[in-house]
Amino acid sequence: MLGTPATEDAAGGSWSGARKLVLCVIDGVAPQMLERAVEEERAPAIARFIEDGVYVDDCVSAFPSITPVCAATIATGTAQDQHLIPNMNWYHRGEARYVEYGSSFAASRTFGIHRSLLDTIYNMNLAHLSPDVQTVFESLDDADVRTAGTTFLIYRGRHRHEIARETPITGLLNRTLFRHGVWGPRELFYADVFASRRTGCRSQLGLPGVRDQHTGCVGSYLVEHDLFDFLLFSLPDNDTHSHKTGPEGQVESIAGADRELQRLADAAGGMDAFLEAHAIIVMGDHSQVLIEDRISLGEAFAAWKVRRPVGPEDGAEIAVCPAQRSAGLYVIDEERRDELLPELVGTALETPGVDLVLRHDDGEAVITSAQGELRFAPDGPLADVRGGTWSVRGDFAVLELQSAHGGVWSDEYPDALARAWAAVTCPTSGDLLLSAAPGYEFTDWGGADHVGGGSHGSLHRSDSQGVLLWCGTGPDRREARPQWTLRDVAPMVRQHFGL
């Protein structure tokens, strides 16, 4: 699919071949809500992309199906057993401390706002994301493709960016809180912290409800001035809106996201002109499910000495890491590991709202639920939908697995074996991982939850199946893959540019 060649700008670097590519990530968009928005004519830009392109309504998320893990998978094409970003909240064994990427303002305040911001903005990319995997920015930068990105959790690239000081308030904050440069795409616009050039666009320091407008402003500027071959166009406000209103409220926030996509097209001279020069991928990172009840891990594991949010370990036995509809438990007292793990599994299974308990044991993944215990490992006689092979034994009812003609699959827990295996074998994951039942969410360290609203994070299909559509790139039919996942997006981007 050939289009107009890219034009070299004063920043240097050029690429000619396929048309430019925009990767748009609408955080938390539920397929049924996107379809409703299109049906109600609230999303005309997306409707055009669907009409001219290929639409997938069941693209499988990562597990935990939570934004930092999903963002790293989208950006690298790998799961966390390779990229090493395990969850929204996790315990850093090497540094003997919690890492909190911003579950809520209250959770960040519990661990220290400054520490949470440093982990989210700096350490996630520069220390926590594995150096052994490449982001799409790094791959394309190495090929001299002009890269650009708006505020997205994973931004690591080959170009150096210093902190922005465009306004007095951002200058003050960036002198006191953020003092160091980062490596990102050629054009990086991350809230008001990093901006590779003056655009006149403001995000009010990444304030929810303003972030999509900032992305639209920056994106239209980049299109108008021909400053990219590849743009990661991040629209996070849908997720925030859905957390408050529940998934049924997404039509309004999807309409807002669509306006920013139309703004991008208008900067190119209208939708026809935009699609003549650009291919586009539009996707969600996960879906959301309505939350009706909460799970307090503090109460459930009160019998153990739980590591406190700050300060020394002081004889703590375990660390507890709630992350919306997923959670991790880390054994700190290594000498008592064999004693503690069975007790922790038993307590987790007795906790109302906990659906699955996952762990790694003697070369196998083990998932336990009220239905029994299931064990599995790669390289066996059963093939999953994507062609991975597994040895599986135990109670298939744990994951509602079906098996026939040498195949194994689950409708309730899509791509369950591969996702669970990546999670339990990730070196930074908890010793136990918990997945909540539909309708339940783990209260975070700040006491916040989304009861009455939406949330995500589990292995269940309700928050694990999302949107993926493409236009002007990729295969001609969704049937090109028997099952699409987040891991397929980075390869599609690289292939678009001949890599």
Where are these regions (language model features)?
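Substrate-binding rim/cap in mid-to-C-terminal beta-strand-loop elements of soluble/periplasmic
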Residues: 306-335, 453-492, 496
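Short, structured active-site-proximal loop/turn typified by the sulfatase FGly-forming signature C/S-X-P-X-R
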Residues: 35-89, 146-148
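His/Asp/Glu-rich, glycine-adjacent segments
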Residues: 78-244, 377-378, 382-410, 429, ...
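Secreted, luminal/periplasmic, and some membrane-associated catalytic domains
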Residues: 26, 41, 57, 64-66, ...
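Short, surface-exposed loop/helix-turn segments at secondary-structure junctions
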Residues: 444-455
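A long, amphipathic alpha-helix that forms part
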Residues: 14-15, 209-231, 238-280, 488
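Short catalytic/ligand-binding loop motif for oxyanion handling, primarily in non-cytosolic enzymes
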Residues: 31-33, 66-68, 82-85, 155-166, ...
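Active-site-proximal N-terminal segment of extracellular/periplasmic enzymes that hydrolyze or transfer
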Residues: 2-55, 65
